[in-house]
Amino acid sequence: MNFRNCLLSFAAFGLVIALMAVPASAQTRVGEAAVVKNEVLRVAASSTTQIKVGDGLVRDEVVRTGRDSATRLVMADSTNLSLGPNATLKLDRTVFDDEHHYRDVAVRMTSGAFRFITGHSDKAAYKITTPLAAIGVRGTTLDILSQRGQTIVNLQDGAASVCTVTFECIQLTQPGDTAIITSGGGGRSTIKKTNNPPWTFAATCSAAAGLCSKTQYADATPVIVDDGSDPTGMLCGR
């Protein structure tokens, strides 16, 4: 093998090694933790890790709060998500339109108490679900309580559409309007509307300083978050 071919082979080998060094789990940052009180966990298939203020969030992330714990997450479009104690949330899907807006963002509120404040994205981009409800928003602040057998959706401002899994829907148009969905067994559920809400997130706001504040995303341009497995801290594509 002549010297030129040797150099080419070495360069190709180096490229393969460099590509292998980029962590496969590196993903686009879609938000960050703005408020963290006590146990706020990032839940993966085989492990859980504590989330700290300023930590980034990525797509398909599951966040869980413990007893006497709370957090507020700020998405890249400045959507604010507040979680009370013993809550579980999954960032199901996030598709960027540009660095300030989502084309599609899906959030699943599995259990617990939440406050959801929409950000800068088109309102049709937001898709919120619980085990019993699908919620569409229009410039909205919503309080959502997801419990076994029941979901309560309370409108603070804006407007929202709340549907059961069998597509029975009601519209929330006035502050205080509340949808209550109750499981009746056999995959069926009932939905009713009231303007005398049995619950709101307001009582949870005192759980942590700043929990019910609204802030803008500090860095609207999505960046890459790695899992710590790259010892150099350098990633391709930055």
Predicted feature descriptions by range:
Residues 31-182:
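Structural recognition of beta-strand segments within beta-rich domains
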